[in-house]
């Protein structure tokens, strides 16, 4: 698959399914390709806020699990083994959350991400899409306003004839890409990374 464009948008759910691990090999490879100018990461203020919210929710759930474990394993505190005692060391919830958010912020900065706001989105068009069940809206998903705003913001940012890859396995995103020639759906980021990396090798 030859690269058609450098522009790449990554759906929020991709990051969630990747466990919000911004140090993973796939995300780090993408970051490196963006730094080299092989790819151009474009996102929106909505996606930024969504991911930050997801990070906070995941941290809260993880810390809850740790506290539940400690409550059930309280008998182990009597053992003087360092490995066991480490399980009961104090955890600063705010520090953990801050570090997780910092990892995301570093990814955005290192990949030289362009962040779009909603100023160029036509609210009337969003309303029409909603009531006419035009992707990303559907009968089963009538409340996809965040996705609609994001996709229309991306469309408004493209120059005439310019295209963008959309990394998502969401059926409604795929339908939107099918209905809009400038949007190219790719199921996985690793697949796009591979083609971009191969292109980079041919160039050098």
Each PLM stretch: what is its role?
Residues 166:
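Conserved nucleotidyltransferase catalytic core and NTase-mimicking acidic/glycine-rich helix/loop elements
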Residues 2-162, 171-204:
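Active-site-proximal, substrate-binding regions of enzyme catalytic domains
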């Amino acid at each position: 698959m030859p690269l058609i464009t450098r522009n790449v948008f990554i759906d929020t759910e991709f990051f969630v399914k990747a466990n919000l691990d911004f140090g993973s090999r796939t995300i780090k490879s993408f970051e490196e390709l963006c730094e080299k100018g092989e790819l151009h990461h474009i996102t929106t203020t909505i996606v930024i806020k969504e991911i930050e919210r997801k990070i906070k929710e995941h941290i809260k759930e993880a810390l809850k699990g740790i506290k539940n474990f400690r409550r059930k394993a309280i008998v182990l505190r009597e053992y003087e083994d360092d490995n066991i005692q480490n399980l009961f060391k104090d955890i600063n919830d705010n520090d953990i959350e801050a570090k997780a958010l910092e990892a995301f912020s570093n990814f955005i900065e290192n990949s030289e991400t362009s962040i779009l706001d909603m100023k160029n989105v036509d609210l009337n068009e969003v309303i029409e899409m909603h009531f006419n069940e035009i992707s990303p809206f559907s009968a089963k998903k009538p409340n996809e306003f965040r996705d609609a705003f994001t996709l229309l913001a991306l469309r408004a940012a493209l120059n005439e004839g310019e295209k963008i890859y959309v990394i998502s396995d969401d059926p409604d995103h795929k339908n939107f890409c099918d209905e809009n020639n400038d949007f190219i759906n790719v199921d996985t980021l690793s697949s796009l990374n591979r083609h971009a990396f191969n292109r980079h090798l041919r160039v050098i």
